[in-house]
Amino acid sequence: MAENIENNGCSQRDSAEHEGYAKARRSFNLIWKERGSAQPKLLEAILHKDNFNRAYKRVKANKGAPGVDGMTIEEALPYLQEHQQELTNRIYRGKYTPSPVRRVEIPKPDGGVRKLGIPTVIDRTLQQAITQQLVPIYEPLFTDGSYGYRPNRDAKGAILKIKEYAEQGYTYAVVLDLSKYFDTINHEILINLLRKNVKDERVVQLIKRYLKSGVMENGVVIETEEGSPQGGNLSPLLANIYLNEFDREFLKRGVPCIRYADDIVLLAKSRKASERLLESSTRYLEEKLKLTVNREKSRTVSVFAIRNFKFLGFALGRNRSGIYVRVHAKSWEKFKSKLKELSSRKRCQSIKPSLERIKVYARGWLNYYGIASMKSNMNDINGWLYHRIRMCVWKQWKCVRTRYRNLRVMGVPKDLGWKTANSRRGYWFTTHTVVMNMAMTKERLINSGFYDLATAYQSVHVNY
C-alpha cells in the first residue's frame, strides 16, 4: 500500500469550490475581526497534502504505541486515506477535538517515574504537521545556547559549549533543576507567547485544544489545566518556546546560558557571581514563568567538581594539556553495570546473540559519549569485558571433554589442555590463565563477533 495519505485528491481543498473550505473561512471570520489582522495562511500550510504526508511518514518512522483509541500506525493509513477530507473540514470549521492522551509511566534512574502522555496516531500526525510549519518560524528566534529538540543540535554540542566557556574563565556553574517541567507549563503564558509569532489564530486555538485535551488514566479522563505532556510530537517545540523567554532574558544580562530541554546551566567566573545567579534565575523561573525550581537539586558548583558537576551524563576535567570533556562517574557505573548484565553467565548461554546484544548497546553508547576523553578507561573496561566473554565461553563448554577438545582445536598442547579442562578453579580465575590467553585470543573472539570497545572508541573519538 502506498504511504501517501490522500486517496482521491486532497488538492481539492485548495479549490474555491471545496465546500468544507468555504464553510471554514466563514466560521473563522469572527476570530480575524477580534484579532484585527489580515488572514494568514499558516493553517492551510499545515493541512497541505505534502506537509501532512511528510508528517505521517515521520510518525510512522518513529513507531510508538497506540493512543486511547487503540489505533495502530498501520491502521491509521487507510483511515486517513478515507477520512482525511472529513478531518480537514472539521479542523477548518473549528469543530475538531483532540482525543485525551494515554498516561504511561516510565521508571526514572533516581527511582521516580516520568509521566508520558501518548496521543492517538491521528493526533500525533496532526501535531507533527503543526511542528513542521512552526519550526522555521521559531528556529531563528531561539538562542545559540539552546540545544535540545532542535535540528543539527545535540547534547555533545551543549557540553562542548560549556567547555568553550570554561576555557574563557567561566568555571562556576549554576545547575537548575525544574520540578516536573513538562507537566507544569502555564497554558495562559504559553498561549500569549505563541501569539507573538503565530499570527494565524486558528493555529493558536488548535494548539490550545491539544493542551486542554486531557489525560486518560485508569479509564478516567482528567482535565489538563497546565502542562504539555511528554510523548506528543508538539510538546518538545512548545517546551522550547516557553523556556526561550528565560534564555533570551539571561542572554540580555550577558550570562552564558546552556540549555538542553529542561536541563539548564548558567555560567559565571566566580562563586559569588554564581550564587547571585542562582537566586535571580530561580526568581525569574518561579515568578515570571510560574515554574517550580527544585531547590534541593539546584546548586552552584565548579565545572571541574569530580562528582558534583554533571550535565547530560558528561563532566569536565583539566590537566596540563587543558580542559577536556569526560564521562561522569555515574554514567560510567551505569555503562559497566549494563555490560555486566549483558555478559552474565545466565545471559550468555548462546554466545553469538549475546555478542550482538553487547555490540548494539556499546555502539549506541559510544556514539553518544565518544566525544569524551577516556582512552585509558576504555582500555580497562575493554579488557574486563574480554575476560567476561571468555568466562561465558568457558561455562558454555561445560563438561571436561568438550573443554579439552576445544582447547586442543585452539592449539593448546595436550598436557596443558587436559590440566586446564580438569581445573576446579572458578570461571573468572580460569579466564586469566596462560592457557586461556593462548586459546581464546582477542583476535579469535573478534572474529566470532566480539565488539572491541577500545578500537571502536578510537574510530569514533577521532572525529572530535
Stretches found by the model and what they are:
Residues 1-81:
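Non-catalytic, polymerase-adjacent accessory regions of viral genome-replication enzymes
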Residues 47-52, 100-102, 109, 349-369:
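Core structural elements
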Residues 75-98:
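Amphipathic alpha-helical blocks
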Residues 90-105, 109, 141-303, 308:
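Conserved polymerase palm-domain catalytic core
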Residues 212, 288-356, 361-363:
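A conserved non-catalytic segment of reverse transcriptases
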Residues 223-226, 324, 340-353, 365-377, ...:
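Short, solvent-exposed helix-loop connector elements
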Residues 372-395:
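Short secondary-structure subsegments characteristic of cysteine-rich extracellular domains
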Residues 388, 397-464:
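Extended C-terminal regions of large enzymes
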